[in-house]
Amino acid sequence: MRKKIIFVCQDCLSRNYVMSWSKQVLNRLIINKYCKHCNQKTKHLDSF
């Protein structure tokens, strides 16, 4: 079964991206994505 993950910008804490991930993986994901609120590429953490 897959789980829905929402990514949160580390700088402004806005929730920008949504992804699905398997429940078997327990590692935290950190990705570099563009944040439209910060107007730059920032690190995004997953929020279960």
Swiss-Prot record:
Keywords: Ribonucleoprotein, Ribosomal protein. One of its GO terms (biological process) is translation. Disulfide bonds: none annotated. Gene3D superfamilies: Ribosomal protein L33. InterPro entries: Ribosomal_bL33, Ribosomal_bL33_sf, Ribosomal_zn-bd. GO terms for cellular component: cytoplasm; ribonucleoprotein complex; ribosome. GO terms for molecular function: structural constituent of ribosome. Belongs to the bacterial ribosomal protein bL33 family. This is Large ribosomal subunit protein bL33B. It comes from Mycoplasma pneumoniae (strain ATCC 29342 / M129 / Subtype 1). The lineage of its organism: Bacteria, Bacillati, Mycoplasmatota, Mycoplasmoidales, Mycoplasmoidaceae.
